[in-house]
Amino acid sequence: RELARFLGINFTTVTRAYKLCELKGLLQAVTGSGTFVASSAARSVTISTERPRSALIDLGFENPFQVFTDQIREITRDIAGRKQFPQLLDYASPTGMVHQKAAGVNWLKNIGVETDPDHLMLVSGTQNGLAMSLLALFDPGDRIGVDTYTYANFIELARLHHLQLVAIGSDEEGMRADLLERQHRLNALKGVFLMPSCCNPTTRMISERRKKALAQVIRREQLILLEDDIHAFFTAGTVADYAGPLARLVPEQSVYVSGTSKPLCAGLRVAYLVYPDRFREALLQALFNVNVKTSSLDGEIITELILTGTANAMVKKKQELAAERNRLFFRYFPELEGQGHPLSFYRWLPIPDTRGGAEVEQAFQQQGIRVYHSDRFLCGKREMQAYLR
């Protein structure tokens, strides 16, 4: 009303403008606080593999540690010499070949996922799996609950799909179930997006107790759970509290995505997407219409890594490398030790700087260093405390 009076225009015109800006991801309404310009309004916050200039020390992009490249080369050569090789080069089996899906089912058992080939598909990476799920299950204007700081590329996906993200507060155990329920009552959420094994960027893990509390709200309010579990292979067997993904508690309302870029190989674009019967038709239509079929060759290489036991060895080696990198970080920042995931591929560093995120990132780049500021990951009202990932 104040803006309408100031501009001398109709109140309903301003209301419509606010709504359009929210759909475009330019504004974020925070219940009880007001409407704020989104931190990502003036620029894309997408984090990609675009190479920085050679002299730049890249401490921002998440490095998944390339290991066992010689073994991958040999497996690829072996596959290329097989009689069935031509079958891996065509459009057949858009959800993955039967034996590839069976291997995926067994692989996911390592992290507490129980499914079968009829409820699993191979997709071309986690990001495409999430994009396909948003296209299939959500409509423009729908609201999705997310952590206050969440995966930057998901923020951009939501903007592309004209979806509104609603920030849900959290504590040391992860997103608070009571706040999720409250925001659903205020904003009529359709779904919730979570990374329970290791939230990107905060490194926070959702405890088993909190998973059960969140599952109760998701079940009771009939929300759709989108679970990105990219870090689960560094959580299972490492974190004592880990009993499996959140999706196992609400399987009929969940789309669960487990990518292989972090535990295995970033360049092989393969992720496993697990879904219930109720979402099958919509997800398959999205897969066929967008045509994001995973390369059968990539799927076969990942399958061979699993069947030969190389995949397990790769995970173990990466766990060792991640532990070594984290020890190095905590040597310089001992006050942060014990916070977040012990084997995270990134850390969340508080900084005493209240400048805007783009300005801080630019200041670091001028010193030859690339880092990512917390503004990239922010949904909702900006806090006084800022961070670097």
PLM regions with names:
Residues 253-341:
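PLP-dependent aminotransferase class I/II
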Residues 32, 116-117, 340-346:
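Short Gly/Ser/Thr- and Asp/Glu-enriched loop/turn motifs at secondary-structure junctions
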Residues 1-80, 89, 288-295, 317, ...:
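N-terminal basic, amphipathic alpha-helical segments
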Residues 28-29, 115, 371:
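Short beta-strand "wing" residues that participate in macromolecule-binding interfaces
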Residues 275, 348-354, 371-389:
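Conserved PLP-binding active-site segment of the aspartate aminotransferase-like
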Residues 38, 276-277, 307, 350-352:
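Residue-level recognition of strand-loop junctions within catalytic nucleotide-signaling folds
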Residues 88-221, 226, 233-253:
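Conserved core of the PLP fold type I
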